[in-house]
Every structure is written in structure tokens, then in C-alpha cells.
Amino acid sequence: TNVTGIATLFPEVVQFIVRKETGINSLAQMEGRKIAVGSKNSGTYYNAQQVLTLAGVWEKIDQQFIGGTDAMKELQEGKIDGFIFTSGLPNPSIIELAKKVEITLVPVEHDLVQKIVNSYSFYFPSTIAPNQYPGQTDEVSAVEINAILVSGPSLSDDDQYLLTRHLFGKPNELGQSHPRLSKMTRNSLRRQMPIQTGKGAYRAHSEAP
């Protein structure tokens, strides 16, 4: 594919959600359990594969290739034990789910966080603050990735440059347009992307203050 990166927009946290009644409190305890890992080849699927492989449990869980609202519905109905979901915090759908069934957010242990960050340049240490979700009273250790703005081959280098320059020129104004963009700054726009930066975007990044 000829997709290139424009800029980093906001962090998304890789969340491991299980039914509280399963008693699962660590990634290792997911062994043998039915865990929804996202649709095959989706972003969530790759996050699940990367994190759980380094945790040593990817091959040991009963992988269910469903994601999003389907996974939440199956968890609510007791058909699966847990699921992985990558999103900004808090996620409204998970808030609604937690009102219907007791859930646990499974932490990514600190040693594993370092292992993940050292293995993949696009992961960063993260925490899920208390009370993001109903019943979640403790801080939860996690990892995050960045949602990025990408460009296809139909966008010219010049247009790519103008778009990127606009982002750098008005991050605060754009941040007011949507809650997910509220923490966007010139520094956050520069965070490393997992794909190559486009030529026009690179020029704008180089010129930005």
C-alpha cells in the first residue's frame, strides 16, 4: 500500500477487559480462556497478538476473532471470558457494558510494559486512571499506541504539506472540536509513527516551530 503518515493525533490505550466473575487478574491467567482478540488483521488483533505473544499467552488462549460491540455483547451474555479493545479513554461503550456486568481491567505488568516498549517503537507506557469505568477504583498499568492521520496516494505532496502545516498551526483550535483531540499539541503531533512520514508532511514537520 502507498499509505504514508501525516501526524500523530491522540493516544489509544490497549485495554484487556474480562468478566469479574472469571477471577482473572493477570494476562497469564487468561490461559485456556475464551478471549476475543478482534477481527483478523484489525488494529486490535495486532495489538492483542503483539502484547500477548510477549506475555507468553497468545498461543495458550482460546482465540475468538470478534471485536468491538460484538465482543462486548458476547461478554455480557457470558459466551466469552474477555476481550481486547484499543481506544481512547474512557470508552463510552465499555462504560455502558460495565453498568450491565461487572468487569475487571487486567493490568499489563510493569516488566512486560518495558519489554513491549523495547520491542516495538510505536508502543508507550500508559496508565488507566481510577474511575474511568464503573467499579474500576484502582489505577491500571497499560500500554498505548498513537492514533495517526494517514494519507493515500491521491493526496499530492503539496496538499499533504498544507494539511500538516494547518495541524501544527492550530492544534488548540482543533483540540476544541472533539474530546479525543483535546490533548493534541505540537509535541504530540511529532510522536513517532509506525509508518513512513509522507514527503509533504515531512517538510511541514521540519518547518514547524
Q: What are these model-predicted stretches?
A:
Residues 53-57, 76-80, 99, 165-172, ...:
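Sec-exported extracytoplasmic/periplasmic mature domains
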